[in-house]
Amino acid sequence: MLAKRIIPCLDVRDGQVVKGVQFRNHEIIGDIVPLAKRYAEEGADELVFYDITASSDGRTVDKSWVERVAQVIDIPFCVAGGIKTIEDAEKLFAFGADKISINSPALADPNLITALADRFGVQAVVVGIDSWFEKETGKYWVNQYTGDEKRTRQTNWQLLDWVQEVQKRGAGEIVLNMMNQDGVRNGYDLTQLKLVREVCNVPLIASGGAGEMVHFRDAFTQANVDGALAASVFHKRIIEIGELKEYLYAEGVEIRR
């Protein structure tokens, strides 16, 4: 059985790490490189960097910090933000990224997933999905351009359909960003994760809602996700990664320590 992964997420805007609540009202957390180094030293299994306004601004990831991060950490890291072409991805891999993640550009052109998977291998291609639960209808919708609240739009894709579509096209991993839960720290949406897990045959990473150690345990044991991604609880030292891993190990979760 593969060890479960603990993944700090760093949302990047204008060269700094920021964090919002439900993808809005972002506050500055600090500089990218020292934070990345800290997480690697504290025992993170992997890091994810989202250049959150790249897609909505119509540009690709600001590459200047990617190379600097690669120089100071020795764990895998994934980069996302406005990657629309093979060339965009090639540059990020050349600077040291281990994986790239696409989200809004995949919705704009689903063939991009296949092109990237064919060129770099499925193991290097992650698809991020921003889901929104519509209480009135009980449906989960996929949103696009969520890095800019003025441009965020609901697509015509329902969540489970899109999860199946991206797998057919070559996604090697899915990060599910559950927008209703984002930054509110009251737990991952286990109902949603279980629904996605039933149709997801590639590694599934939960994102949005972690506030306590038990939330990580529940995502792993109840929804059988492969990794749990979190931001504010790590940025604000509400949870220390080393302590979290000891707790999960004691709770019977297969984890790298």
Swiss-Prot record:
Q: Which Pfam families match?
A: His_biosynth
Q: For this UniProt entry, what is the primary localization, expressed as one broad class?
A: cytoplasm
Which subcellular locations apply to this protein?
Answer: Cytoplasm
Give GO cellular component annotations, separated by semicolons: cytoplasm
SUPFAM superfamilies cross-referenced by the UniProt entry: Ribulose-phoshate binding barrel
Tell me which residues this entry annotates as catalytic.
D11, D130
Query: Is Lyase one of the keywords UniProt gives this record?
Result: yes
GO terms of biological process kind: L-histidine biosynthetic process
Q: What class of enzyme is it?
A: lyase
Keywords from UniProt, A to Z, are: Amino-acid biosynthesis, Cytoplasm, Histidine biosynthesis, Lyase
Q: Which residues cross the membrane?
A: none
Reactions catalysed: 5-[(5-phospho-1-deoxy-D-ribulos-1-ylimino)methylamino]-1-(5-phospho-beta-D-ribosyl)imidazole-4-carboxamide + L-glutamine = D-erythro-1-(imidazol-4-yl)glycerol 3-phosphate + 5-amino-1-(5-phospho-beta-D-ribosyl)imidazole-4-carboxamide + L-glutamate + H(+)
Q: What EC number(s) has UniProt assigned to this enzyme?
A: 4.3.2.10
What GO terms are given for molecular function?
imidazoleglycerol-phosphate synthase activity; lyase activity
* Pathway the protein acts in: Amino-acid biosynthesis; L-histidine biosynthesis; L-histidine from 5-phospho-alpha-D-ribose 1-diphosphate: step 5/9
InterPro entries listed in its UniProt record:
Aldolase_TIM (IPR013785), His_biosynth (IPR006062), HisF (IPR004651), IGPS_HisA/HisF (IPR050064), RibuloseP-bd_barrel (IPR011060)
The record's comment on protein family reads: Belongs to the HisA/HisF family.
Q: Quaternary form?
A: Heterodimer of HisH and HisF.
Q: What does this protein do?
A: IGPS catalyzes the conversion of PRFAR and glutamine to IGP, AICAR and glutamate. The HisF subunit catalyzes the cyclization activity that produces IGP and AICAR from PRFAR using the ammonia provided by the HisH subunit.
Q: Output this protein's name.
A: Imidazole glycerol phosphate synthase subunit HisF
Gene from which this protein is expressed:
hisF
